[in-house]
């Protein structure tokens, strides 16, 4: 009997509701569950010479059948990013966001699993930014704000993380000194809004929150541990074209494998009026400004002053 791949995939995911699987994981299950059908598929093909070839073919077919399967099964959903994950959920988009915010996202710890809330994502993002871009990051805690303007006066004002990129980290000392004398820029300032889950129900709210609290910087990013649905990513690309806020998919299992799905559009100048508002209202942001000033004064950034992951000597 020939392998009914589409039905088998849906049956497998339905038997494991809310659990997310990559196409490769599903393909491995197919090979283990339907050995005779998979062997027949391999034998009937002139191109599938090895088991690895068969597995890769199943992965490709799962991906190619995804649009058709999602049209037929409304509860079949996918995440965006690498690798794409497949899952079945009866929850609405709004309910999925609420569940993520209440429970968190799954991150493996050894063989066990732990649930990460939004605050648990910050050190993972800091680690990625440092390893990938050499960006010194700093957490901005909105609880350290004055709130002089009332309960909603500072709504969407503060980013979750801010960062400083040392443009001359690899420059010769003479070049650094020359730039200082020339009074040219030595840094790019970054700003980040972090979310556990972005889907169709909250994509515009999340994006415009990022526009509101990160447009002061050279590079503003919306960061998400999970992005559900191709329509969500399409919407974000459309919004980027108008506003320039980028998108980072944060890999909670392996932060170094996180991806910039949409590069932010650089702003040539800092919006110092907004930066002043942030520094006036929030002690963490004021400390960030002081650290940037200190860097320009000394030419050095001390990792101990920033949320930079410690390295072993």
Residue ranges and their predicted role:
Residues 22-23, 95-133, 298-313:
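Charged, often low-complexity linker/regulatory segments
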Residues 25-27:
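A short acidic, leucine-rich amphipathic alpha-helix
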Residues 198-203, 216-254:
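Nucleic-acid nuclease catalytic cores
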């Amino acid at each position: 009997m020939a392998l009914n791949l589409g039905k088998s995939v849906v049956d497998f995911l339905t038997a494991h509701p809310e659990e997310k699987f990559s196409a490769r994981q599903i393909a491995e299950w197919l090979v283990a569950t339907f050995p005779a059908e998979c062997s027949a598929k391999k034998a009937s093909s002139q191109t599938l010479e090895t088991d690895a070839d068969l597995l890769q073919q199943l992965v490709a077919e799962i991906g190619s059948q995804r649009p058709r399967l999602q049209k037929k099964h409304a509860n079949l959903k996918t995440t965006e990013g690498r690798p794409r994950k497949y899952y079945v959920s009866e929850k609405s988009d709004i309910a999925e966001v609420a569940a993520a915010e209440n429970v968190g996202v799954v991150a493996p710890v050894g063989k066990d699993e732990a649930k990460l809330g939004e605050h648990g994502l910050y050190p993972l993002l800091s680690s990625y930014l440092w390893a990938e871009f050499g960006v010194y990051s700093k957490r901005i805690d909105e609880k350290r704000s004055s709130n002089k303007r009332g309960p909603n006066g500072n709504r969407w004002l503060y980013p979750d993380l801010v960062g400083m990129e040392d443009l001359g980290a690899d420059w010769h000392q003479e070049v650094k000194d020359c730039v200082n004398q020339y009074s040219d820029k030595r840094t790019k300032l970054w700003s980040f809004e972090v979310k556990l889950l972005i889907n169709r129900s909250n994509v515009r709210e999340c994006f415009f929150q990022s526009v509101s609290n990160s447009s002061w910087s050279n590079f503003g990013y919306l960061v998400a541990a999970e992005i559900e649905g191709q329509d969500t990513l399409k919407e974000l690309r459309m919004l980027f074209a108008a506003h320039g806020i980028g998108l980072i998919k944060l890999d909670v299992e392996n932060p170094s494998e996180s991806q910039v799905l949409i590069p932010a559009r650089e702003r040539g100048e800092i919006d110092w009026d907004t930066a002043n508002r942030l520094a006036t209202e929030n002690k963490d942001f004021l400390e960030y400004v002081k650290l940037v000033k200190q860097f320009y004064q000394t030419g050095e950034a001390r990792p101990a002053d920033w949320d930079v992951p410690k390295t072993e000597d």
